[in-house]
Structure formats: structure tokens, C-alpha cells
């Protein structure tokens, strides 16, 4: 959104020629689109926890470049990794979710399965957990007309086909992406921003692999407007969850990055 400035240090993307070691102890990867309706998308990776990055590299899936990437991946082994993304619909608008896999360290990516039928509105920004070798659960930001909510889909065949589950969140206001993690005790923790009054950061817990969800737990509700959210959560060794997001409150006009540390 907006006008992109000219960067003197801009690097043009190239094809990845050296396989990525997905199991490097300090590995991180980010996937980013250049246009949110038509792509293409780029891949960057790091072997020092994000201090320095290699890339950009072109991201192509089964010959398609209309990938609308946001970062959502699950490492399987040294050379195999699954990504959960969206691509352009038939009308060249965002977006239809899918999953893909590489088996050669990111040199090539192949489509595994589409996540649901093509929507009239959009299904974007998946956040996914692996429940077993063949079972995955993904949560997806959805929009149809004036309705904004969150869907959940479950696969029991390693991403080839997906079954729709009851929606974890029925109303997100103006919409916001999910962050889904699997806790150490096996429960699932879903965090998200709500762009409706009271503007807030919230969480839900599932004890049955996403079939049902707890009531909403409000982490904070002092937002000054709807420009909040885009949550990421991680569980610490002590069991507490660190939930990060951008936020605006009534104390100052600028948006800022914040975190809430809480015990699920």
C-alpha cells in the first residue's frame, strides 16, 4: 500500500543455486510479496537468527509466480520444508491459500494442495502447526463482502486435502491475520488483533486440535484505533507466551511494536 521509494542499495532477485540447510541451528526464513494481488514473491534466509540475510531469491511454485507470500513455514528435515501461502485467484486478485513443499533445500517448490475452494473474497495469511507426520492445522484470514473472520482447516494427508472446521474467530472487525502455535502441553494457542471496538489483542486456546476453542482472552484492549495487530507469538521455556504486534494507543500518535508476556 502506498508508493514505494527508490532504494540505492536495492538488490534484484535471482534464482537460488545453493540448497538451504533448513535444520541449521540458527536458521530463519522470510517470504515476501512484491504485489499483494499478483505477486511475485521473494525468499530470504539467515543462518544467524536474522542478523544477516541471504537473498532475495525468486519464489516459484510448480511453475507459478503469482504467489502472495507471507512468512509461514514448517521445517521437515535438512532439505525439506513446507510453506503455507496464498496465490492470485482467477480474476488476478488476492487470494487463494495453498501449501507447497521443497525436497531439495529450496531450489524447487512443488504444489501439495489447495486449502479449500477459491473464495469470492479472499483467504490469505495462513498460520499453521504440524500435529503429526500427516496432520496439519492452519488458520486463515478471511473476507467475504463486509464480513471479516478467521477460518480453520485440517489436513490428515500431509497437506494434499483439507477439511473446514468451525471458525475460531467469527468477527475481526476490519480483519487481521492469525498467529497459531502448539504449546508444550499439546494445546493450541491462537493470537490475533481485533480491528473493532474495543481495539484489542486477544487469544484463544484449543484442547482438541482446533475442533473447538475457548472463549476470548483479552491481552490488552487499550487501542486507540484499528491500525493494530499482525501478531506473532512464541512460547518460552518457562511456559509463558510472548505475543508481539504493532499497536497504537491514546498516549502518543505513533504506531509502535509491543509485546505482551502471559501464561496460557
Stretches found by the model and what they are:
Residues 1-264:
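Asp-box/BNR beta-propeller blade signature and adjacent active/binding-site loops
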Amino acid at each position: 500500500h502506498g508508493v514505494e521509494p527508490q532504494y540505492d542499495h536495492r538488490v534484484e532477485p535471482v534464482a537460488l543455486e545453493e540448497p538451504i540447510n533448513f535444520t541449521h541451528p540458527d536458521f530463519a526464513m522470510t517470504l515476501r510479496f512484491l504485489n499483494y494481488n499478483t505477486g511475485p514473491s521473494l525468499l530470504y534466509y539467515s543462518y544467524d537468527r536474522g542478523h544477516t540475510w541471504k537473498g532475495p531469491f525468486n519464489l516459484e511454485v510448480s511453475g507459478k509466480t503469482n504467489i502472495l507470500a507471507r512468512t509461514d513455514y514448517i521445517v521437515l528435515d535438512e532439505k525439506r520444508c513446507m510453506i503455507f501461502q496464498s496465490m492470485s485467484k482467477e480474476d488476478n486478485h488476492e487470494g487463494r491459500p495453498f501449501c507447497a513443499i521443497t525436497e531439495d533445500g529450496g531450489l524447487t517448490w512443488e504444489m501439495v494442495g489447495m486449502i479449500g475452494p477459491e473464495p469470492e473474497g479472499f483467504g490469505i495469511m495462513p498460520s499453521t502447526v504440524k500435529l503429526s507426520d500427516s496432520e496439519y492445522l492452519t488458520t486463515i484470514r478471511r473476507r467475504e463482502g463486509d464480513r471479516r473472520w478467521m477460518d480453520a482447516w485440517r489436513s490428515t494427508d500431509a497437506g494434499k486435502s483439507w477439511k473446514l472446521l468451525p471458525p475460531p474467530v467469527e468477527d475481526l472487525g476490519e480483519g487481521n491475520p492469525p498467529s497459531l502455535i502448539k504449546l508444550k502441553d499439546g494445546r493450541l494457542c491462537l493470537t490475533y488483533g481485533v480491528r473493532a471496538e474495543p481495539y484489542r489483542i486477544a487469544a484463544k486456546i484449543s484442547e482438541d486440535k482446533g475442533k473447538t476453542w475457548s472463549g476470548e482472552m483479552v491481552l490488552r484492549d487499550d487501542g486507540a484505533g484499528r491500525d493494530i495487530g499482525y501478531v506473532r507469538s512464541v512460547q518460552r521455556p518457562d511456559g509463558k507466551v510472548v505475543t508481539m504486534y504493532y499497536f497504537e494507543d491514546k498516549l502518543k500518535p505513533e504506531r509502535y511494536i509491543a509485546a505482551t508476556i502471559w501464561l496460557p
